[in-house]
């Protein structure tokens, strides 16, 4: 055992570590060890997701968790978007008792304000052989970002085909997420580790219904609602608040949520960063 505190971070669907913004840096500044797993089918090309099942994601994070729990007296888990579903299922599977759990924008329900009315039709398509492998679900505006400056940068990254996030995912992969959403609803009442739920009021992908469900269903959970972000809360306007809440919940000093350079800028009256004059390098 190292005597240090470890944190396992899990990114979202089609994403990378950038889904979590600069949270890993805040954890390290605070004295923790941040470990970011790359889920199977990610970090390469979207086509590689087509043959990956949800079980592979859970097996991968379980293996990582088992390796880390041998190193740390305290081990926390945090997940963003789909990664939050994986994180909850992991903690349920291993009966996580070595630390706490943070669920960031968990999509238990796909019912946000930007989701199309015909979203439920995908369940019919799931029954048609071969269709889900060929159909693509494209990323598009607003990219989970309320801040217009950051959103414009994200749009440029997609246009340049940067590797920070897949531009699309196969519909068959959405089916795997739907499977996990059902598992989460069943597992939540028996996932007993202390849990923090962070969710944006204006999340365009998944409404506050998801957060309220988790808060009510889980035995030891509390929810904090963010008022100035869309879905990608680790990179949007509330990113510093997210880092503060997570650090404090995990027992770290929340003062480390912002970098020393940003802290000096704020001390000089440089503003809160809401207009993103300095976009964090963890922008998704």
What spans do the regions from the language model cover?
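Gly/Ala-rich beta-loop-alpha elbow adjacent to hydrolase catalytic centers
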Residues: 79-83, 87
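The serine-hydrolase catalytic nucleophile loop
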Residues: 14-24
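Alpha/beta-hydrolase
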Residues: 140-187
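Flexible "cap/lid" loop of the alpha/beta hydrolase fold
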Residues: 101-128
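Conserved alpha/beta-hydrolase
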Residues: 30-46
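Catalytic active-site module of serine/aspartate enzymes centered on a nucleophile-bearing elbow/loop
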Residues: 222, 228-284
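Conserved alpha/beta-hydrolase "acid-adjacent" motif
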Residues: 204-210
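Short beta-strand/loop motif that positions the catalytic acidic residue
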Residues: 191, 197-199, 203
